[in-house]
Amino acid sequence: MSKRREFIKSSTIATIGLISLNQNLYSLQRNSDRKIRISLNPGAVGIKCTASELLELAIKYNFDSISPIVSEFQDMDQKEIDSYLEKMSENRISFDVSGLPLQFRTSKNQFNSGLGTLNNHCKVLNKLNVKGFVTWIMPTNNELTYLKNFNIHKERLKECAKIIGNHGMKFGLEFVGPKTLMSRDQFSFIRTINELGELIDAIDEKNVG
């Protein structure tokens, strides 16, 4: 059993999807030339750690990438950032993309108040050589019809894309479709690749995909 699988098991809160992946995936070495890189995101597996602890875990358990803990890097000076990046490079570990640091599914006021935070995150992530952001699209909504929800997503994600693009970064969108989510609320929303493509076309920004 590889170090990475031992780590996931020891956390006791890893998702079934991670645990059930083929053993051969976990036996791959971090420094191989495979195109798919395995990233350690502490939030995804339910652990709390500092940026330094996250990097040590990635080194110990042979992960290829780590999620940037932006709040910590905001408080670092350039010398500290350079030292962190050097340690990553020595161990052939890169940063994964970042999640959006704002609420775009709730009220307009909450969304607007988060735009400044997004801009500040972009500045920090540029120092870390992070390539962009990613967020997921929920497949249902309990209050908004498909068209109303589509228009809100188009307008708000376009604003996000412009800020992200101004910093030379990309913005990835993901649809999710487990049955538990698809049947949760009253109104259906994006749940297929074709529908997601329509949203990307409507946003109409070159850095969105």
Show which residues each predicted segment covers:
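Active-site groove signature of glycoside hydrolases
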Residues: 127-146, 167-182
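Alpha-helical membrane-embedding segments
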Residues: 152-153, 183
